[in-house]
Amino acid sequence: VTSPLLCVRDLKVVIGGRHILHGVDLDVAAGGVTALLGRNGAGKTTTVRGVLGLVPRTGSVRYGGDETVGMTTHQIVRRGIGYVPEDRGVFVALTVAENLRLAERDPDPAYDLVHELFPELKQRARQQAGTLSGGQQQMVAIGRTLLNRGNRLVIADEPTKGLAPRVVTEVAVALERAAQAVPVLLVEQNLALVRRLAAHCVVLADGRTAHAGPAAELLADTEKSKTLLGVGRRADVTARGGDH
């Protein structure tokens, strides 16, 4: 059996005396898309931040076989983790092209791929990122991640939140292409997107792991989906932007 690329065990986070995570277990396979699911407030974003060392944490976070608890965020990310945060993380004072160049990759076929996935970025190369729509900024954030040849894992935190349906579709295609090269940990509440992309899922509830298994099985199980995720019908609806 292939060992997971990312193996999280008993991850706990306490912030300001408040217990946010009570012991999360999470595996991300060495290929494909793993979805991290849960209702609002379940601890999904805090789990990602804990994995990246952005918040104080205890437990074990093994990445590529190495323990990363005790490392700084810079040390962790330098080991090959691409991060698309919920707030998109673009540099608003830089142009689109300058944001993409932060990936430190010389022009090569990867730029062609980004422009193929997001034609608007080529058209708006000289435009300041701060003047872009939220959807266009998300394209920049994902495009920058795709251009970083050092990434061995991509973590995307609710990448379709609040986006128009057309942009949701473009983001889905981009994540599919990314997953052909590196594993993806996808935090998402758009269950149609999860159904399309993810082979495996982990569900959090109240800061703990409540379920782990094949995504298709969970999303086809009406009762379990309703209990864990709060959906009252089969979770195979058409993807919509802002479906949160």
Which residues does each PLM region occupy?
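Glycine-rich phosphate-binding loops of nucleotide-dependent enzymes
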Residues: T2-H244
